[in-house]
Amino acid sequence: MALQSPNIADVLQRSFEDASFTARKVVGDQRELSKINKDFGQSYRFEYTNVKIKEPLMLRLDTKVEDTTLTLVLNGPTQLIKIPGLTQKQNLSRAPGRRQTPLDFGLVTPSMFKDLFVAKFVRVDRATGDYVFDLTYLPKLDDTSRHRIWIDPQKRFTTRREWYNQQGRQLATFYYEEPKQADGVWFPTKVTVKNMDNKVAGVTEYSGVRINGGLSADLFKI
């Protein structure tokens, strides 16, 4: 009798409710980042970003460039960008590839699979024992970009992610490292991105990580 393939439900971070931390740029090589795509290097122009994540699919980023503060809030498919003198609201329901999710930070949470992603088991990685899944968007969202992810089945965090565009071309590989555990959740504290020349384009480290601290939903109001 054949063994049943692992399901994404087996490795979701069900204990995750929210997280807050500071993301600090360690490496941001604009030449190598530009090989990923023309816009990818923009986030590496910030020395630090204060990040808040909350289920289901809420994100807040606060940063500063010189004397200018910038806030980005995502609540479901709605995005709000605020800088002094400008507030811009967008509905990204038809542009799911532009939405940031817990996946960007190495987490796979239940809300990602409600009206956004579909997961297909690929294999067990022989070298690491990680489960490998392909994540695609629901067909109704009309976006054929995808992610191939490696998940540690015990600690339930993403160790590696390959990013493919809508033409099926791989753009980059992300490595999620140095996980720390808090309140039953393993959370990576270092992210390295390599381009398709296998050159390190960016490195980000997370400090002051607080898991399930009870972040107010008011922080994510749009």
Pin down the residues of each PLM region:
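Flexible, processing/modification-adjacent segments and terminal tails
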Residues: A2-D10, R14-S15, N37, G76-R146, ...
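N-terminal mature ectodomain segment of secretory-pathway/periplasmic proteins
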Residues: L3-T87
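Residue-level detector of beta-strand structural context in well-folded domains
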Residues: T49-N50, L59, L70, F117-V122, ...
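Short, basic/low-complexity N-terminal boundary segments at the transition from targeting/disordered tails
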Residues: V26-L33, I53-L57, Q100-F105, Q154-W163
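Short, mixed charged/polar active-site loops
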Residues: G41-Y48, T69-T71, T87-K89, T144-R146, ...
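Gly/Pro-enriched, hydrophobic low-complexity segments
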Residues: T128-K221
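Generic beta-strand structural signal
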Residues: I53-K54, V73-N75, V124-R126, I151-P153, ...
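Short amphipathic beta-strand/extended segments with alternating polar/hydrophobic composition
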Residues: T71-G76, Q88-G97, T173-Y176, V203-S207
